[in-house]
Amino acid sequence: MRLNTIKPGMGSTKPRRRVGRGIGSGLGKTCGRGHKGQKSRAGGFHKIGFEGGQMPLQRRLPKRGFVVYGKKQIQEIKLSSLLLIDRNEFDTSVLHEFNLIKSINYPVKIIADAQACTRAIRLKDLRVTRGVKDIVEHAGGQVELTIEDVNGI
């Protein structure tokens, strides 16, 4: 077998449609477009959603909801995923290095899950929940926040 002898499987491809090549082909004369009308003409196109002058559906339905501009995108990380890393000190640069967060520009929050903290770790400039703070401090670690957020996030 060679690359130039490989062919697609039987019935997997259709021959392309050749139009305007005589009435015997079934696609001669009008080329499958029918007689007259906008869609039979060259460039006969109407925009998507146009209903012939009737008020289009997307304009008949009422608007709903709104977009919150300036919404904070908080990146949440489980405490158990931090414990898998062989480090004792964590900040945004360490989390980014281990691909736990996508960007260092958005705030990070550590959330608790079922697993308890087995070793003393130090969380620096990372927002935490009350549960995480209790778990970390109970294990002998500490949570340092040098930047206080106005909303307490």
Swiss-Prot record:
Biased composition range(s): Gly residues: 21-31
Recorded GO MF terms: rRNA binding; structural constituent of ribosome
Keyword set, alphabetical order: Ribonucleoprotein, Ribosomal protein, RNA-binding, rRNA-binding
Entry-linked Gene3D superfamilies: 3.100.10.10
InterPro entries per record: Ribosomal_uL15 (IPR030878), Ribosomal_uL15/eL18_sf (IPR036227), Ribosomal_uL15_bac-type (IPR005749)
Cellular-component GO terms for this entry: cytosolic large ribosomal subunit
Region annotated Disordered, chain positions: 1-42
GO terms for biological process, alphabetical: translation
Family: Belongs to the universal ribosomal protein uL15 family.
Protein purpose: Binds to the 23S rRNA.
Subunit structure: Part of the 50S ribosomal subunit.
Protein's UniProt name: Large ribosomal subunit protein uL15
Organism: Nitrosomonas eutropha (strain DSM 101675 / C91 / Nm57)
